[in-house]
Structures are given as structure tokens and as C-alpha cells.
């Protein structure tokens, strides 16, 4: 099997020739640029710059040489874009390592803090001295009463939402006729250049975007106070996303294998809402988006990035049309690997949960890391329905020898 065949077999619940591996195939299976620079040095790779494609999380593009070293089977569609040197500009990581960042990122240093700004000069996020990542500092609707809104300005405020404004490569291309042509050309070239599975990030967040606009604690309160307004917002977001989804899939659907939607529905102690609230506030519109995507691209796997303890929601997610999810946060309440595999493994693909990044990967010995990986893979992988990745991104302070021990364990 080649990499694409391996991933597709797993997604179709067939046993592949070996466990498929994702390293940097999306924004929650990646590696912080500081850790990536150390990994390159440890591997003796002295060529190539460090390209930071996700400014908020400070994630590096994983180069083909390292994808080969770890045996990665997945690449993200965004690497098909920003291929010219002029598409990048110089910057320096918090530890002093030189790197490149996308040309369209508006960044400014004031004192010892770095600010990411919108095109019209609003501070959206800050990396304060001593920090390693950017945090949101501006919420467009923070003082707005949702009951008085008709949500007709959604497209406008997206430009002032940190995650939407600071797009990763590919996401910066508008869905105009010319933009869709560029997306299709890039996707076609990437498909022709790799036998790895291609994952395309669409987004389509219904629960998270209101938090980015109102501020998280405000929106969670509004869910209790103003249920009808929140449901109107879910409908408005769905209406906003749908034309873009149709254009985007028309352009890249023939070339990708997985479409990634996003919505963090869980926290460390379980879902951020009851199953009943999920069914009322989000499931109808998730279902519309996901099932429309499947209609437009039947061969493409419908995938959700969804952090946290989401076990009580999984049956509803499957019913809404979801086929797979990352990062499978096994240290959260309810996310016992054996239970997940036994309960849902015949109809749902777990993409993640392969190594505990909270305790084991950053702090464990090589032997402890390998045992952790062996134990988890032995639970998740039988019968297919599993793609390996560590639980979310590898953070800046993880030693390179620990990273390599993790991937060695998968190959073993």
C-alpha cells in the first residue's frame, strides 16, 4: 500500500498494511516551530528554513525529508500554496531562532510584546514577553446584545476574528472565480506530486466562532439566556458557510481525501454542553454542512477537529454525518480508549489518541513513551478505523528524542 491507500483503508474500516501516521497533516497534529527547529538539528538536517504557517499556534510546515523520516501518510492541502520565496518574510521565534512567516501577516512589536493586527489596524492577538503563542485580545461583538442582532454583518466581522483573519496558507485565498481557479490548480499539482493522503481544512465552525466574536464566557452565558438568538446565529453561520463550501469543494474536492471541519465541543471534564443542547443548538446545522459536503464529494471523508471529552456527543455526531475526528483527547473524562473503540470503532474513525501529550510525551523516558504508544495503538488500530497522531500538537518544549521515540514506537 502507498500512503493514500493506507489512510483510505483505515477510514473505510479495513485493516491497512501498517498503522497510518499523521504528522503535521492539519493544525492539531503538528509541531511548534521551536520544537521543529530542535528536531531538525537532532536529525542532522541543516538545509531549509523554518516556515511558520500558523501564527497563533506557532506551527511549522513539516518538510518532506522529515515526513519521510517519521513515515507520515498525510499532508495538508495548504502546502500547495505560498510556494515562492516572495510569499514569506523574515521573523524570529521567541527563542531567537530565525524563521519565515506568511507575507500577508500583519505583525508589530511594541516594547517586548508582539501583536497580530487586522488589515485595518485592530490588534487581534498578542504574544507577550516570555510566552510562546498568541492569544486573542479583540472580540468584535463583546458588547453586543445577541437578541437585537440579525447577523447580517457576519462576513464583515469575520475579518476581525483572530482565527479567521489570520488564515493559514490556502485559507487566505478568496472564493472568487479566480481564487477557486488557484485553489484547484494548487490542489491538482499537490495530488500529482504526492502519494500521501491529502487533508483539506474548511472550518465551518458553529460553536467556536460565536466565542471568537462575543468572548467565550459571554457566549456560553447567552446559550442559557438567549436560546433562540443562538439558534438563529447557528442558522446564519450555516447560511454563510454553505456557498463557500460548495465553491471550495468544486475546486479541491476531486483532489483531496479528507475535509476537516472544526468545533471544540468538549473540555477536560466532558462536553461544554449537554447532549440535548447539542441536538438543539448545533446538530441540525452541522448535519446540513456535513451531508452537503458528502453529496458534493462522496469519496471524501467527513472529519471534525473537536477537542475535549466529547464521548456523550459521539452518537449524535455520527448521526449528523461525521465519519472521523481528531485529536481524541484520551486524558479527558469519558475518553477511555477501550470504551471508545468498543462502542464506536465499527462506525467511526479515531484520528489521534496515539500518545499522551499532557504527561508522557513531554516528560516521559523513551521507554515510557514507547509503552504508551504501543498500548494505545494496540487498542485503536485493530480492524482499521484508526489514524495515528499524538493528542494535539507537539509543544515547544518537547525534546526531539521523545518525538522520535514516539514515531519509532508506531513503526514497531
Regions found by a protein language model. Name each.
Residues 68, 76-78, 83-84, 96-104:
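Aromatic-residue-lined binding/catalytic grooves and analogous aromatic/hydrophobic interfacial grooves
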Residues 59-77, 252:
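Catalytic domains of carbohydrate-active enzymes, especially glycoside hydrolases
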Residues 2, 71, 93-96:
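Residue-level detector of functionally special positions within alpha-helical transmembrane segments
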Amino acid at each position: 500500500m502507498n500512503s493514500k491507500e493506507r489512510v483510505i483503508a483505515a477510514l473505510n474500516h479495513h485493516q491497512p498494511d501498517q498503522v497510518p501516521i499523521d504528522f503535521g497533516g492539519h493544525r492539531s497534529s503538528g509541531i511548534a516551530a521551536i520544537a521543529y527547529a530542535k528536531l531538525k538539528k537532532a536529525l542532522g538536517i541543516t538545509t531549509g528554513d523554518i516556515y511558520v504557517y500558523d501564527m497563533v499556534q506557532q506551527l511549522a510546515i513539516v518538510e518532506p525529508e522529515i515526513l519521510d523520516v517519521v513515515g507520515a501518510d498525510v499532508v495538508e492541502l495548504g502546502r500547495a500554496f505560498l510556494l515562492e520565496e516572495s510569499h514569506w518574510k523574515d521573523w524570529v521565534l521567541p527563542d531567537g531562532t530565525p524563521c519565515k512567516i506568511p507575507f500577508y501577516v500583519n505583525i508589530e512589536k511594541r516594547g517586548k510584546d508582539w501583536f497580530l493586527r487586522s488589515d485595518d489596524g485592530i490588534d487581534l492577538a498578542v504574544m507577550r514577553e516570555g510566552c510562546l503563542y498568541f492569544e486573542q485580545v479583540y472580540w468584535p461583538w463583546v458588547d453586543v446584545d445577541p437578541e437585537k442582532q440579525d447577523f447580517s454583518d457576519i462576513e464583515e466581522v469575520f475579518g476581525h476574528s483572530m482565527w479567521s483573519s489570520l488564515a493559514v496558507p490556502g485559507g487566505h485565498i478568496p472564493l472568487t472565480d479566480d481564487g477557486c481557479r488557484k485553489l484547484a490548480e494548487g490542489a491538482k499539482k499537490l495530488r500529482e506530486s504526492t502519494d500521501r493522503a491529502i487533508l483539506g481544512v474548511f472550518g465551518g465552525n458553529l460553536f467556536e466562532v460565536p466565542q471568537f466574536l462575543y468572548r467565550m464566557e459571554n457566549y456560553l452565558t447567552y446559550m442559557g439566556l438567549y436560546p433562540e438568538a443562538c439558534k438563529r446565529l447557528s442558522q446564519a453561520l450555516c447560511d454563510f458557510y454553505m456557498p463557500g463550501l460548495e465553491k471550495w469543494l468544486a475546486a479541491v474536492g476531486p483532489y483531496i481525501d479528507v475535509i476537516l471541519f472544526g468545533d471544540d465541543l468538549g473540555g477536560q471534564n466532558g462536553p461544554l454542553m449537554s447532549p440535548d443542547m447539542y441536538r438543539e443548538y448545533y446538530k441540525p446545522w452541522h448535519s446540513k454542512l456535513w451531508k452537503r459536503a458528502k453529496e458534493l464529494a462522496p469519496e471524501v471523508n467527513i472529519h471534525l477537529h473537536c477537542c475535549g471529552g466529547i464521548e456523550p456527543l459521539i452518537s449524535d455526531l455520527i448521526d449528523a454525518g461525521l465519519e472521523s475526528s481528531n485529536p481524541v483527547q484520551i486524558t479527558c473524562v469519558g475518553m477511555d480508549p477501550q470504551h471508545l473503540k468498543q462502542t464506536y470503532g465499527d462506525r467511526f474513525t479515531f484520528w489521534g489518541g496515539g500518545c499522551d501529550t499532557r504527561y508522557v510525551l513531554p516528560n516521559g523516558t523513551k521507554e515510557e513513551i514507547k509503552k504508551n504508544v504501543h498500548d494505545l495503538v494496540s487498542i485503536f488500530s485493530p480492524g482499521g478505523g484508526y489514524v495515528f497522531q499524538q493528542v494535539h500538537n507537539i509543544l515547544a518544549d518537547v525534546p526531539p528524542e521523545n518525538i522520535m521515540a514516539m514515531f519509532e514506537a508506531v513503526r514497531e
